[in-house]
Amino acid sequence: MSILVVSHDAGGAEILSCWIKHLKIKEKIIYCLKGPAISIFKRNIGSFENLHEKDIKKIKIKKIITGTSWDSDIEKKIILYGKKNKIFTCSFLDHWNNYLERFTLKKKKVFPDKIIVSDHYAFGIAKKKFKNVPIQLIKNYYKLEVLKKIKLKKNKIIKKILYVAEPIREHAIKQHNNPMYWGYDEFSS
């Protein structure tokens, strides 16, 4: 039996691929990636076979691990597939906003069996939003890799790091019809 990893958006793909790279998973991992996730996984874990979502029914799956995309429904569709087929599902939340929207498919909530977060702030928000879903806090291996790269540049003094992993400009347009609703976007911040 295999573990199926499903991802689309960049933020979740960075965290999920770095997590997989650092784990010693003995089971076979099968990937179903779309969008920016494909190149991110190639950069972080090397070559892999990328399965089309329609071919998932052909394999025996033990567990499904997903990102949580804002701009794609692939993870939600696969979580729903897992639920219907009694396959354990867990999803990585890679940010601090739009939690419920990440699990909404055609106006219905589609929650995994477990939600994984990688910082204490996200853990607190997730505990409040998802009272009936177990929440697990793990190390953020992506953040550790970024910090390691920054430390290699010893000649520069860095006091603060702003990490924007969301296309917040698109979120602001969708939610408020104003790309600069918050006074900044992922490019100007």
Residue ranges of model-derived segments:
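Donor-nucleotide binding loops and adjacent catalytic segments primarily
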Residues: 17, 21, 160-189
